[in-house]
Amino acid sequence: MGKDYYCILGIEKGASDEDIKKAYRKQALKFHPDKNKSPQAEEKFKEVAEAYEVLSDPKKREIYDQFGEEGLKGGAGGTDGQGGTFRYTFHGDPHATFAAFFGGSNPFEIFFGRRMGGGRDSEEMEMDGDPFSAFGFSMNGYPRDRNSVGPSRLKQDPPVIHELRVSLEEIYSGCTKRMKISRKRLNADGRSYRSEDKILTIEIKKGWKEGTKITFPREGDETPNSIPADIVFIIKDKDHPKFKRDGSNIIYTAKISLREALCGCSINVPTLDGRNIPMSVNDIVKPGMRRRIIGYGLPFPKNPDQRGDLLIEFEVSFPDTISSSSKEVLRKHLPAS
């Protein structure tokens, strides 16, 4: 059973964007570790941040509503709009979410250390209206200035692109890749930074094509005035010593002699799973000739139980020299055109 983000924020499933913002503001103030000293506060603060990041983003919310937490984080929501798989991973830093929401400032420095002039404590302030109005802050935590940059105006940094090279064997069987990234994260004050390493786990599905994109939303560097960039990995095929790839087909080049091309031969054709398939070639091998072994290629991405084909191309080796008597025999028996 996945997390119920609506329950975490204390709202109904049909809540509006404004309801989500108000709920996050209330819960974030309630469970912020600078105020709430209970042992569970830090974990609740993190859950609230994750719930807000999902429900405040229309695409992530749509996927979550349809597939739940497992579908959102497992890539069940289809593509990212660029042909890649969309999957969400929470960045793990609720303080960065808090700082971005409240404009990169720390409102706790203002009112958590003392009671307000009107006599209300912080618990009352989170329940009643706008807790920051007395300090010149708007409801989203930004100064009341028409020229200020609020969350609705933040722009996301361009995606950070990485190539992810995989072998044909890995595409054939599927595999798991763990990629280490380093990024800057905002501290709780919303101004200073710290370096942070993170391991991103990528499930390579059977048959994925070169160019497939895997997107980790907002895993890039954090800054006070922009949304972190998405980290995007693009699948690239490694060169293979035996095979070339053609979509879901693979191509093997069999080297044979001129005599074998004319008189026939038997060859062993290797496969990606380590077997050898014997093949008899009785026809004359002509330029461009191919043979096909059905079902021995790569899995189809959308139907991995079915596979493409193994294509055999022939490369004929010609002798460097030939004797006069052999030439005479060839002239006698081979057609002139």
From Swiss-Prot:
Q: Which GO terms describe its cellular component?
A: cytosol; plasma membrane; Z disc
| Free-text function comment from the UniProt entry | Probable chaperone. Stimulates ATP hydrolysis and the folding of unfolded proteins mediated by HSPA1A/B (in vitro).
Tell me the residues on which Phosphoserine occurs.
Answer: 122, 148
Under the heading CDD domains, the entry gives: DnaJ, DnaJ_C
Signal peptide annotation: none
Q: Which domain of life is it from?
A: Eukaryota
Q: Name one GO molecular function term.
A: ATPase activator activity
Gene3D superfamilies, alphabetically?
Answer: DnaJ domain, Urease metallochaperone UreE, N-terminal domain
Does the keyword Chaperone belong to this entry?
yes
Highest classification ranks of the organism: Eukaryota, Metazoa, Chordata, Craniata, Vertebrata
| Name of the protein in its database record | DnaJ homolog subfamily B member 4
Q: Tell where it localizes.
A: Cytoplasm; Cell membrane; Cytoplasm, Myofibril, Sarcomere, Z line
Alphabetized, the UniProt keywords read: Cell membrane, Chaperone, Cytoplasm, Membrane, Phosphoprotein
Could you describe the subunit structure of this protein? Homodimer. The C-terminal section interacts with the C-terminal tail of OPRM1. Also interacts with SDIM1.
Q: Where is the J domain?
A: 2-70
**Annotated SMART domains:** DnaJ
Q: Which InterPro entries match?
A: DnaJ_C, DnaJ_domain, DnaJ_domain_CS, DnaJ_subfamily_B, HSP40/DnaJ_pept-bd, J_dom_sf
Biological process, per Gene Ontology: chaperone cofactor-dependent protein refolding; negative regulation of transcription by RNA polymerase II
